[in-house]
Swiss-Prot record:
Cleaved by a non-enzymatic process after Asn-96, yielding a glycosylated protein of 55 kDa. The process is induced by other proteins, and requires neutral or alkaline pH. SUPFAM superfamilies: Immunoglobulin. This is Immunoglobulin heavy constant mu. The record marks 96-97 as: Cleavage. Keywords: Cell membrane, Disulfide bond, Glycoprotein, Immunoglobulin domain, Membrane, Secreted, Transmembrane, Transmembrane helix. The gene is Ighm. Constant region of immunoglobulin heavy chains. Immunoglobulins, also known as antibodies, are membrane-bound or secreted glycoproteins produced by B lymphocytes. In the recognition phase of humoral immunity, the membrane-bound immunoglobulins serve as receptors which, upon binding of a specific antigen, trigger the clonal expansion and differentiation of B lymphocytes into immunoglobulins-secreting plasma cells. Secreted immunoglobulins mediate the effector phase of humoral immunity, which results in the elimination of bound antigens. Residues 1-104 are annotated as: CH1. Expressed in bone marrow. One of its GO terms (cellular component) is immunoglobulin complex, circulating. InterPro entries: Ig-like_dom, Ig-like_dom_sf, Ig-like_fold, Ig/MHC_CS, Ig_C1-set, Immune_Resp_Modulators. It comes from Mus musculus (Mouse). Residues 324-435 are annotated as: CH4.
Amino acid sequence: SQSFPNVFPLVSCESPLSDKNLVAMGCLARDFLPSTISFTWNYQNNTEVIQGIRTFPTLRTGGKYLATSQVLLSPKSILEGSDEYLVCKIHYGGKNRDLHVPIPAVAEMNPNVNVFVPPRDGFSGPAPRKSKLICEATNFTPKPITVSWLKDGKLVESGFTTDPVTIENKGSTPQTYKVISTLTISEIDWLNLNVYTCRVDHRGLTFLKNVSSTCAASPSTDILTFTIPPSFADIFLSKSANLTCLVSNLATYETLNISWASQSGEPLETKIKIMESHPNGTFSAKGVASVCVEDWNNRKEFVCTVTHRDLPSPQKKFISKPNEVHKHPPAVYLLPPAREQLNLRESATVTCLVKGFSPADISVQWLQRGQLLPQEKYVTSAPMPEPGAPGFYFTHSILTVTEEEWNSGETYTCVVGHEALPHLVTERTVDKSTGKPTLYNVSLIMSDTGGTCY
């Protein structure tokens, strides 16, 4: 006997609409007899679907029949219309039956828009120095999107690139996308507080993200200038006195100038170095000039002058050698490695203890077989006040060598320089065979360059 089919809609189990994958919709008819059946498809407005239809062969199950029809539609044909469903028309036994098959909901997610700005030291190249603004739109769907840039509200026609839209997390539901656009800017425009806008257009909506430099011209009190006197180590090693002028809290190093001059106004050759950028976005810089030791020791005065566009007038800082303080030469003790350490056969530590000196400025170096060792080979502590002896200082320097070097009879020398020593320098030498330091008074490692006064 004839049995009419029961019909059911079929929808895709895949993630919601993307811009590439076809959308599968289907119609299932089952429990019918005899086996002759056909399907057609219409849009919601009754126009016929003529492409992408596939009807599968009829299957016999439990004495009756089952059949399915599938339609594959591109997202474009759905997204551009307002259809909420398709109509599956089942033709059986001279009768027709319509079944509404709902179109899968279109996932719509607005983009998250962020613009990343360059750090203060992020500009490079010849003037005008350049850097980049990076606009990132993430977590949006569907895929079609447009990114553009504005400068002070006017559309930027060139100088930017926009990467292809990419999938964020494959397999996620719904499928989301991201896109990155990069705009090249000049340091001058950035520091002049030009406002840059990343504009993102998606699904008829516009998303704007504005950025600009927040470093307005700083008041003059924000820029700080310090003078740093030459250290004894510099004087001892190079026979010249290096005057340092440290400038901090700079919003930019453009227009910065640091110059040194003598008390008579004679300019000194000044080397300027941009030191670093700080977490608060400011810069430090220093200007260094070398003068002869005699002028420094004779307490001649020198002046550092700093000019910058954020200063209403030049900053001037004066420096000269401080008045005499009580001088006392250091006592130097050289300690060989401890036997317990050597028994481990790993390393050997030679310690140079320097005590009872004043002023605190001192130089400590090491020699191996008479050759100067690089500073990376040893560690010297900063001078500390001597306990129970006000006005006096101590320090220690540790040289670590291999156990094999020590046992081979290598000689190690601690060289100490201090202005209260008769020849500015003294040294102690130790090796395995003696086990006791030997005292020498030398002036062998002072530089023969620089510092000559005329």
